[in-house]
């Protein structure tokens, strides 16, 4: 992965996403791994969540523009699970947005990202779509692991993420493996 540009915008973007996710975790507690199909706020992406997510929306800077970010997030099994989406309205901004989302996740945990290509069924193919594995520390100093998937559909970017002190492979694989864009 090439060296990241200054991260002032991406850090703000991830802080907004992480803040919303942690707020949702405090507000929405449900049994661990009570799997359910959930559609993204725009109805285009489906995922299996192990808890009942709540919707949060916020405007933030991403890829040189201001977007409305819709985040569905919940806490289950000691992890925070989220699916965020934003419409950039301009396909030329997608690569930068995917890079910023991935870089911001890494910066938030002060972690070196391990990335691999990602293909979500039905998603618009994009070379910037990827899975990112992170291990580091949250701003409060607590150790954390995070798995992130960033991808596109049309002019929208999506970020699915799981954050926790420890991430069991099976539920994380179920969640990220369930992502699909609906026809």
What are the functions of these language-model segments?
Residues 52-61, 65-71, 104-152:
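Signature of long, low-cysteine stretches enriched in small and polar/charged residues
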Residues 36-68, 76-77:
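Post-signal peptide N-terminal segment of mature Sec-exported envelope proteins
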Residues 25-28:
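C-terminal motif of bacterial Sec signal peptides marking the signal peptidase cleavage site
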Residues 53-55, 97-113, 154-183:
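Surface-exposed amphipathic alpha-helical segments
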Residues 71-100, 148:
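A short acidic-to-branched-hydrophobic micro-motif
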Residues 30-32:
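Bacterial signal peptide processing site
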Residues 78-81, 141-143, 152-159:
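Coil-to-beta-strand transition motifs
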Residues 2-21:
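Bacterial N-terminal signal peptides that target proteins for export
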């Amino acid at each position: 992965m090439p060296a990241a540009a200054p991260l002032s915008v991406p850090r703000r973007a991830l802080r907004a996403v992480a803040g919303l996710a942690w707020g949702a975790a405090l507000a929405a507690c449900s049994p661990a791994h009570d799997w359910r199909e959930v559609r993204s706020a725009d109805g285009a992406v489906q995922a299996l969540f192990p808890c009942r997510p709540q919707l949060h929306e916020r405007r933030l800077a991403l890829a040189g523009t201001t977007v409305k970010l819709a985040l569905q997030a919940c806490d289950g099994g000691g992890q925070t699970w989220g699916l965020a989406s934003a419409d950039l309205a301009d396909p030329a901004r997608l690569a930068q947005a995917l890079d910023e989302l991935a870089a911001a996740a890494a910066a938030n945990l002060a972690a070196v990202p391990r990335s691999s290509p990602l293909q979500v069924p039905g998603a618009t193919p994009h070379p910037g779509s990827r899975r990112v594995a992170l291990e580091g520390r949250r701003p409060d100093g607590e150790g954390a692991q995070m798995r992130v998937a960033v991808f596109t559909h049309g002019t929208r970017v999506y970020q699915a993420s799981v954050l926790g002190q420890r991430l069991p492979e099976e539920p994380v694989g179920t969640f990220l493996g369930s992502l699909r864009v609906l026809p």
